[in-house]
């Protein structure tokens, strides 16, 4: 309901998960992706549209998570419902305005793997925060030594069919309990 309001929106905020929309319902989303306006995506948005995503740019079908957001859910990198996540700010991005005032990120959700093992975040993405899986579900639990930190927040630029660049921010944390973290609220 209300998807028609996306046409006049100045920002699209997505917190979707495996939505299947009719051609008529998905049209405003595709039109927005061509608008050059910013996109803000939270947690499961990277697998928000798995079915019926009829969007093509330069003759190539667009994969929403991978192409638009910079990474799609591939697996739980942490132990699902057993680990929690400590956010680690990327040193080289300390001056980024998105990180201004962000000091402590922690959440009970686990880290998502958004690219194949042995690879990295796509080159057109700028990692802002890495997520270190912890060995439990408490703020002060130790890092899981068997799990490397993976990007959990990044920016990129998306260019749709009209050639208009759009700024994209994606954070793979974002469950309700994650937002008890003042650092994550500040980031998002």
Please state what every model-predicted region is.
Residues 19-23, 144-145, 179:
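Acidic-and-aromatic substrate-binding clefts and catalytic sites of carbohydrate-active enzymes
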Residues 10-15, 170:
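Structural motif
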Residues 39, 127, 168-170:
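Conserved beta-strand scaffold positions in the cores of enzyme catalytic domains, especially
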Residues 1, 184-188:
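Short, intrinsically disordered, charge-balanced linker/junction segments flanking boundaries
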């Amino acid at each position: 309901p209300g998807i028609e309001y996306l046409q006049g929106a100045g920002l699209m905020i997505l917190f979707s998960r495996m939505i299947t929309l009719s051609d008529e319902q998905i049209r405003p989303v595709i039109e927005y992706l061509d608008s050059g306006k910013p996109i803000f995506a939270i947690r499961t948005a990277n697998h928000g549209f798995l079915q019926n995503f009829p969007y093509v740019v330069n003759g190539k079908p667009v994969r929403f998570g991978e192409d638009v957001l910079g990474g799609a859910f591939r697996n739980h990198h942490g132990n699902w419902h057993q680990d929690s996540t400590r956010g680690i700010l990327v040193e080289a991005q300390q001056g980024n305005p998105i990180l201004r005032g962000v000091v402590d990120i922690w959440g009970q959700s686990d880290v998502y793997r958004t690219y194949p093992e042995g690879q990295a975040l796509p080159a057109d993405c700028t990692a802002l925060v890495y997520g270190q899986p912890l060995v439990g579900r408490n703020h002060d639990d130790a890092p899981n030594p068997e799990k490397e930190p993976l990007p959990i927040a990044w920016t990129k630029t998306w260019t749709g069919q009209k050639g208009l660049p759009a700024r994209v921010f994606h954070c793979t944390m974002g469950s309700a309990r994650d937002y008890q973290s003042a650092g994550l609220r500040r980031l998002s």
